[in-house]
Amino acid sequence: YDNDGARQAVQAIYSKLYNIIVQANLVIKHAEDNAAAFPDEATRSVILGEAYAIRAYCQLDVLRLFGEVPGGQGTKVSLPYSEVTAFDERATRYDFTGYSEKLIADLDKAEKLLKDNDPIFGYTFEELNAPSSVEIEDTYMCYRQSRLNYWAVKALQSRMYLYLGKADPKYLAMAYDAAKAV
């Protein structure tokens, strides 16, 4: 880790993850503050759900790459769980448990927002891939299998719970349940 190339690579990964997180936070803030900007509540919920999911996806990678080993006896670290919308704002730092709770909350929010609003439940993949063959009000809702849809959130929950299960076995059953839903 003393090599300049390695340091630059690590810094680039860390910076890019937090750049994406801040962008997701901006979407969340805008969607929560400007409901009238969306054609309907379902669209707003899908976009919010995707933003919470992408934030959690990146934050989970931050934890895996830069956090402490779950259940390990290694160095204890605190990581910033960013909910800020500006690059110059400092995010609150959390220990492993606090960080994990924030991840769980974000994915639970994403799941709830997508569960009743994601068009993936009302159409087949074929219909969503050929928006001209069915009447879909907003073409943004097409190609849902290529986005962070409800099933992707369930898979991400399973991945997160499996990772957290190394520290606390109660998460293993939750990982199984989330994976079974997919």
Regions found by a protein language model. Give the residues of each.
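Structural register within alpha-helical repeat arrays
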Residues: 48, 55, 62, 150, ...
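Hydrophobic-face positions in mid-chain alpha helices that act as interaction patches
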Residues: 131-132, 140, 147-148, 162-165, ...
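Inward-facing hydrophobic residues that define packing positions of alpha-helical scaffold repeats
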Residues: 21-24, 100, 107, 114, ...
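Structural signature of alpha-solenoid helical repeat junctions
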Residues: 40-47, 54, 77, 99, ...
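Flexible helix-coil transition and linker loops at the boundaries of alpha-helical arrays
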Residues: 33-45, 113-146
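Short, flexible, mixed-charge acidic loops at enzyme active sites
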Residues: 69-82, 127
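Conserved, well-structured interaction surfaces
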Residues: 1-66, 92-97, 112-114
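Short coil/turn linking the two alpha-helices of tandem helical-hairpin repeats
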Residues: 63-70, 118, 163-169
